[in-house]
Amino acid sequence: MGTTGTNDGATTPPANTSTPAVDIDVRDLGTVDYEDTWHLQANLAAQRAEEKIPDTILLLQHPPTYTAGKRTQDSDRPTNGLPVVDVDRGGRITWHGPGQLVAYPIIKLADPVDVVDYVRRLEQALIQTCEDLGLHGTGRVEGRSGVWLPAGVINGELKPARKIAAIGIRVTRGVTMHGVALNCDNTMEYYDHIVPCGLADAGVTTLTEELGRDVSVSDAYSSLAHNLVDALNGDLPVHS
């Protein structure tokens, strides 16, 4: 995904990415069933399209759940027999569960709708959250969604590029659904049974794994909430 850059690598966020520019309602849902939350999102998105509610961000965790986006291949699906929820977001298969902080922004994008700009803002919020928590060097990988750590030698071991946060969205009637998932201190066990996001040549990691100390969902919560609001309001510059 491309952006129009300035000389320092930052972009000037357009003023009309979402409306209103302020007044985003952030809701903490705790741990909630995936399908129940999916239905809640659809209900809120319909209300947002009719201007009945303000822009809203849902912050939560899910019980262990595999979800498959519209591009999921049969070969991506789990080998451990666990059920999969087929959903209407983009992307392929992923896992949600305890220790992973999930955010679902229900945002009315301004016309003309710019989905690339919206995704860039989500990525920037995640990158800044990692920085806030002491994890430096996260960024984007061309042609792949989400937030990544680059391949490299760490403690004498060659590690592949590793995804620390996933993004999958849907836009209907100009309103966003689904969103982002930041791996904090969740288990990696469930990823062993799928091809996460359809990427067989890449790894998955957590804040806890990379920082060598426990980083819980509660540790990341305030930072991610703040950075999402700032990114969506245009107060957090988007860097290429």
Curated annotation (Swiss-Prot):
<dbReference type="GO" id="GO:0033819">
    <property type="term" value="F:lipoyl(octanoyl) transferase activity"/>
</dbReference>
<comment type="pathway">
    <text>Protein modification; protein lipoylation via endogenous pathway; protein N(6)-(lipoyl)lysine from octanoyl-[acyl-carrier-protein]: step 1/2.</text>
</comment>
<dbReference type="GO" id="GO:0005737">
    <property type="term" value="C:cytoplasm"/>
</dbReference>
<keyword id="KW-0963">Cytoplasm</keyword>
<keyword id="KW-0808">Transferase</keyword>
<protein>
    <recommendedName>
        <fullName>Octanoyltransferase</fullName>
        <ecNumber>2.3.1.181</ecNumber>
    </recommendedName>
</protein>
<dbReference type="InterPro" id="IPR045864">
    <property type="entry name" value="aa-tRNA-synth_II/BPL/LPL"/>
</dbReference>
<dbReference type="InterPro" id="IPR000544">
    <property type="entry name" value="Octanoyltransferase"/>
</dbReference>
<feature type="compositionally biased region" description="Low complexity">
    <location>
        <begin position="10"/>
        <end position="21"/>
    </location>
</feature>
<comment type="similarity">
    <text>Belongs to the LipB family.</text>
</comment>
<keyword id="KW-0012">Acyltransferase</keyword>
<feature type="active site" description="Acyl-thioester intermediate">
    <location>
        <position position="197"/>
    </location>
</feature>
<comment type="function">
    <text>Catalyzes the transfer of endogenously produced octanoic acid from octanoyl-acyl-carrier-protein onto the lipoyl domains of lipoate-dependent enzymes. Lipoyl-ACP can also act as a substrate although octanoyl-ACP is likely to be the physiological substrate.</text>
</comment>
<feature type="binding site">
    <location>
        <begin position="179"/>
        <end position="181"/>
    </location>
    <ligand>
        <name>substrate</name>
    </ligand>
</feature>
<dbReference type="Pfam" id="PF21948">
    <property type="entry name" value="LplA-B_cat"/>
</dbReference>
<feature type="region of interest" description="Disordered">
    <location>
        <begin position="1"/>
        <end position="22"/>
    </location>
</feature>
<feature type="binding site">
    <location>
        <begin position="89"/>
        <end position="96"/>
    </location>
    <ligand>
        <name>substrate</name>
    </ligand>
</feature>
<feature type="site" description="Lowers pKa of active site Cys">
    <location>
        <position position="163"/>
    </location>
</feature>
<dbReference type="InterPro" id="IPR004143">
    <property type="entry name" value="BPL_LPL_catalytic"/>
</dbReference>
<feature type="domain" description="BPL/LPL catalytic">
    <location>
        <begin position="51"/>
        <end position="236"/>
    </location>
</feature>
<dbReference type="GO" id="GO:0036211">
    <property type="term" value="P:protein modification process"/>
</dbReference>
<feature type="binding site">
    <location>
        <begin position="166"/>
        <end position="168"/>
    </location>
    <ligand>
        <name>substrate</name>
    </ligand>
</feature>
<dbReference type="InterPro" id="IPR020605">
    <property type="entry name" value="Octanoyltransferase_CS"/>
</dbReference>
